[in-house]
UniProtKB/Swiss-Prot annotation:
Encoding gene, per UniProt annotation: SPL
Effect annotated for changing residue 312 to A: Loss of interaction with TPL and loss of repression activity
Name of the protein in its database record: Protein SPOROCYTELESS
GO MF term set: DNA-binding transcription factor activity
Top-level taxonomic group: Eukaryota
Complex formation: Homodimer and heterodimer with SPEARs. Interacts in vitro with YAB1, YAB3 and YAB4. Interacts (via EAR motif) with TPL, TPR1, TPR2, TPR3 and TPR4. Interacts with SPEAR1, SPEAR2, SPEAR3, SPEAR4, TCP1, TCP6, TCP8, TCP9, TCP11, TCP15, TCP20, TCP21 and TCP23. Interacts with TCP2, TCP3, TCP4, TCP5, TCP10, TCP13, TCP17 and TCP24.
Keywords (A to Z) from UniProt: Nucleus, Repressor, Transcription, Transcription regulation
Disrupted-gene phenotype: Complete male and female sterility.
Location(s) in or outside the cell: Nucleus
Region listing for Disordered, in residue ranges: 1-20, 33-62
Record organism: Arabidopsis thaliana (Mouse-ear cress)
Length: 314
C-alpha cells in the first residue's frame, strides 16, 4: 500500500515562499527508517567578515625620483594636518588671535629711501632700508624708530628693532651702524655721515614733494621740513620752471636747477631759532663761495648704505 509523503517545516517563522522551502531543505532517512528534513547550510562567507574585505593597497613608490618622493611626503603631511585640525574651531580661533606679527615692508614707490617717513597720525619710521621701510605695528617711538612690545612673538632669524635712544644706545637698531652725536647732542643725531634732527622728523605729504617745496619758508620751518638732494633729483622737472622757484639761494641771490643746491639743519625749528639753510654743490659757478657750518651736515638717509657726507667745507 503506497503512502503519501508530506513535507512539513518545523520552523513556522521562517516559512515565506514554499519554493524557497523546498529549495533549501533535503530529505534525510536514518537507520530506523524515519524521514526528516534538514535545511541546507550556506557555505558562503559572512558579510561582515574582515577576510572578505579587500585591503586598500598603497601605491608602490619604487622607481620614483627623490623630488617626487619628497613632494608626496609633504602632501601626506599636509593631509594629516588638515584632518587633525578639522572640527577643532577653538584651537583655530586661538591661533588666529595669537598670530605672529612680522615686519611688513612698505611700498618703496611711496616711501623714498633715506627719508624719515610718516604713515598716518604720529607714525614715523626710520628710512634708508634698501627695499623700503621697516614697519612693525605695536609701538612707535617718537624719534622715528619702531619698538615692539614684550608680548609680540617674532622669529629668531628676524632682528628686533627697539626704541631709538641717542643717549643709551650707540648703534642703529635697524641697520646696526654706529651713530655719533654731532655738535649739540640734543639737536642732531648722525649715523655713518647722515644726520637728522630729533625735533624735525615730519616729512612732506605723500602726494607729492613739489607742492610742499612751493610753500613759504615759515611754513616749512614750522612743519620741520628736511631737504634731501636725492628727493630733488627724483622730483619732476616742472617744479623748477614755475614762477616761484623753490631752489633760490639766499647767499648768492641766484636761482638754479634742483641738483645744484643742498641744505642742512641749523638750530631748533620748533622754537623758531633755525630751519633749513641752503648752499651750493658747485659754488664756483656763480663766482661766490658759501660757507658751511662745520658742526651741521646735509641731511641724507640716516640708515642708507650709500650715505654721502656733505659736511665738508666747500
Amino acid at each position: 500500500m503506497a503512502t503519501s509523503l508530506f513535507f512539513m517545516s518545523t520552523d513556522q517563522n521562517s516559512v515565506g515562499n514554499p519554493n524557497d522551502l523546498l529549495r533549501n531543505t533535503r530529505l534525510v532517512v536514518n537507520s530506523s527508517g524515519e524521514i526528516r528534513t534538514e535545511t541546507l547550510k550556506s557555505r558562503g562567507r559572512k558579510p561582515g567578515s574582515k577576510t572578505g574585505q579587500q585591503k586598500q593597497k598603497k601605491p608602490t613608490l619604487r622607481g620614483m625620483g627623490v623630488a617626487k618622493l619628497e613632494r608626496q611626503r609633504i602632501e601626506e603631511e599636509k593631509k594629516q594636518l588638515a584632518a587633525a585640525t578639522v572640527g577643532d574651531t577653538s584651537s583655530v580661533a586661538s591661533i588666529s588671535n595669537n598670530a605672529t606679527r612680522l615686519p611688513v615692508p612698505v611700498d618703496p614707490g611711496v616711501v623714498l629711501q633715506g627719508f624719515p617717513s610718516s604713515l598716518g597720525s604720529n607714525r614715523i619710521y626710520c628710512g634708508g632700508v634698501g627695499s623700503g621701510q621697516v614697519m612693525i605695528d605695536p609701538v612707535i617711538s617718537p624719534w622715528g624708530f619702531v619698538e615692539t612690545s614684550s608680548t609680540t612673538h617674532e622669529l629668531s632669524s628676524i632682528s628686533n628693532p627697539q626704541m631709538f635712544n641717542a643717549s643709551s644706545n650707540n648703534r642703529c637698531d635697524t641697520c646696526f651702524k654706529k651713530k655719533r652725536l654731532d655738535g649739540d647732542q640734543n639737536n642732531v643725531v648722525r649715523s655713518n655721515g647722515g644726520g637728522f634732527s630729533k625735533y624735525t622728523m615730519i616729512p612732506p605729504p605723500m602726494n607729492g614733494y613739489d607742492q610742499y617745496l612751493l610753500q613759504s619758508d615759515h611754513h616749512q620751518r614750522s612743519q620741520g621740513f628736511l631737504y634731501d638732494h636725492r628727493i630733488a633729483r627724483a622730483a619732476s622737472v616742472s617744479a623748477s620752471s614755475t614762477t616761484i622757484n623753490p631752489y633760490f639761494n639766499e647767499a648768492t641771490n641766484h636761482t638754479g636747477p634742483m641738483e645744484e643746491f643742498g641744505s642742512y639743519m641749523e638750530g631748533n625749528p620748533r622754537n623758531g631759532s633755525g630751519g633749513v639753510k641752503e648752499y651750493e654743490f658747485f659754488p664756483g659757478k656763480y663766482g661766490e663761495r658759501v660757507s658751511v657750518v662745520a658742526k651741521t651736515s646735509s641731511l641724507v638717509g640716516d640708515c642708507s648704505p650709500n650715505t654721502i657726507d656733505l659736511s665738508l667745507k666747500l
